[in-house]
Amino acid sequence: MENSKQVKSTEDLSFELSKPFDKSEIKWRPQRQTKDGTSALVLAYVDVRTVQDRLNTVMGIDGWQCKHISYGAKTICHLGLKFNNDWVWRSDGAGDTNFEADKGAISDSLKRAAVHFGVGRHLYDLPSVFVKIQKDQRGQIKINQDDCWQAVRRKQSDIS
């Protein structure tokens, strides 16, 4: 049986890698709270599985690989993508996170390395915004995702 896999150009792959994520794939996390604890500055992010799905979809499961190396409290991800049978490598790192430190550093370093190939770069164009927050019984911050998007639209309309 003949291999029917169509080879895409580097430009086509780069375009597909850098496509914005669907709004439903983007989440918001608090960066810092106001002194009175009623609002928080929130930042847009995607889960590492969303990045892995993009790499699998665009590059194929055999078209990318990553290696993680720890340097003290920092983790460096070396991410390789196969373009026209040649591996192209980019690296970036992250420190331990407040929640599941090692896992967070591994995930964050992969996401940061993927940005070098355009994956998720558009997230840096979204403004950080303040939104009202709620806290659950354990004191965990709860953020309404719709409130975040409304605040982004307001801020972007103020800028233009």
Regions found by a protein language model. Give the residues of each.
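Positively charged, aromatic-enriched nucleic acid-contacting surfaces
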Residues: L41, V46-S157
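N-terminal, Lys/Arg- and Ser/Thr-rich interaction peptides
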Residues: M1-L41
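Accessory terminal regions of nucleic-acid processing enzymes
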Residues: S160
